[in-house]
Amino acid sequence: MAETQTTKKGAKRVRQPVPARRSKPNRPAKAAPGPHASLSFLRVAPRKVRLVADEVRGMPVGDALAVLKYTPQAAAKHLSKLIRSAVANAEQKGGRVDVDVLVVKTLTVDQGPKMRRFMPRAMGRAFRIEKKTSHVYVELGTAQ
């Protein structure tokens, strides 16, 4: 049913009723994530972290830590600590967990904010330098 209103100048305006809001469809609940850990604002470029992350994604945790121990890239040390943190989270939540059955299920590397700095150049110019950061997320699962 539409209502009519009169404006100050005498014109009539018809107001349409506002449709009722639709409820959200019933979606299945997301599965609870397994043991996980995250690292934010890592001061290594995401491209460099992804090179190391691609090496250990899908590996058993023990093998992944062994590979990272002998990887010379700076990101390897940070990823190793992150995986050990996820293992500790698994032990904290579920009691004693066998590391041999845990696998690096997901390992995502996203770009964080860039810190912009300026490098003085010749004749009064300045070039912008972007110091990139990364956000890393690791989730462990059981071997299938």
UniProtKB/Swiss-Prot annotation:
User: What ranges does the record list as Basic residues composition bias?
Assistant: 9-27
Q: Which InterPro entries match?
A: Ribosomal_uL22 (IPR001063), Ribosomal_uL22_bac/chlpt-type (IPR005727), Ribosomal_uL22_bac/org-type (IPR047867), Ribosomal_uL22_CS (IPR018260), Ribosomal_uL22_sf (IPR036394)
Disulphide bridges, residue numbers = none
Q: Which CDD domains match?
A: Ribosomal_L22
Task: Specify whether Manganese is a keyword of the entry.
Answer: no
Family under the similarity heading: Belongs to the universal ribosomal protein uL22 family.
Q: What does this protein do?
A: This protein binds specifically to 23S rRNA; its binding is stimulated by other ribosomal proteins, e.g. L4, L17, and L20. It is important during the early stages of 50S assembly. It makes multiple contacts with different domains of the 23S rRNA in the assembled 50S subunit and ribosome.
Entry-linked PANTHER family: CHLOROPLAST 50S RIBOSOMAL PROTEIN L22-RELATED (PTHR13501), LARGE RIBOSOMAL SUBUNIT PROTEIN UL22M (PTHR13501:SF8)
Question: By its UniProt entry, which NCBIfam families does this protein fall under?
Answer: rplV_bact
What is the protein's name according to its record?
A: Large ribosomal subunit protein uL22
Q: Which gene encodes it?
A: rplV
